[in-house]
Amino acid sequence: TWSDVSPKDKLEILLLDTLTNTVATVAESNSWNVQQGCMAQWLGPEFKEKIIYNDFRNGHYCSVILNVFTGHEERIISVPIYTVATDGKTALTLDFSRLYRLRPGYGYYNVPEITATERIPDKTCIWRINLENGNVTPLLKYTDFANFEQRKDMVNAEHKVNHLMLSPNGKRFMVLHRWFEGRRKYTRLVTCNIDGTDMYNLSDDDMVSHCFWKSDDEILAFENKYNGGPGYYLMRDKTREYVHFWPGISGDGHPSYSLDGTL
């Protein structure tokens, strides 16, 4: 257990062999937090030799594609990753420095935030990454979210984005848009095409927490509904259709589905 939600210690990435019951250190990272580590994950489409993880090198955040069996770093990307497509070709990322100030357990401390004095920065907040050639493309700004189906409580609030997640087919992604008006926090769930077009305000009843794609057009979320209260709702993307699951459960959690969506 760590007392700091964004520790400054170096993190070791371990590979556990369940057949031989051995443990090996395959990499280290200087950018991590207690909620999501350094985003270390197996890289598709094979998910058996390569991992990708975030690090801080030469004064900059980056992400590293590593073959865990040869130890060869196959590519160093100039930005960190947040969510990765299952085909291993595309990723999305956000501003980890602003996230660190507004939610330290999810951000990284290494690089000072350049938007700290701006409540609604006219600056990029989501980027698209080509993992095959390293190209990084700006997608959306904070102002894009603040001006999209704007509510009165957004106008003088401080804005951030978090919890990016690509759909299983990699064509759309979801993101939590959050804003703070005094001590009050508001959250809505927005979905969008992978190129930043066709934004859709899927859930805007003040609170959305943990979410998961069940399929390419269905999302399960713990959220609030004005006519149903907090709970788990399965929503169909780009529609107003939803089903309230397990009405007797009102506590927040981390929902997930099996690969085929049956469990």
Report residues per predicted region.
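Blade-terminus and WD-like Trp-Asp/Gly-His loop motifs, strongest in beta-propeller folds
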Residues: T1, G37-I51, Y82-T90, H163-R172, ...
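Beta-propeller domains
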Residues: D153-G231
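Multi-bladed beta-propeller domains
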Residues: L15-Q36, N67-P80, E132-H159, T191-V208, ...
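Short consensus segments that form the blades of beta-propeller domains
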Residues: W2-P7, F56, I114-I120, D153-V155, ...
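Asp-box/WD-like beta-propeller blade repeats and closely related beta-sheet repeat scaffolds
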Residues: E28-C125, L139-D153
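Loop/turn-rich, solvent-exposed surfaces of beta-rich toroidal or solenoidal domains
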Residues: G228-P230, W246-L263
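Catalytic phosphate/metal-binding cores of nucleic-acid and nucleotide-processing enzymes, i.e., regions
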Residues: D9-K10, T25, Y200, E223
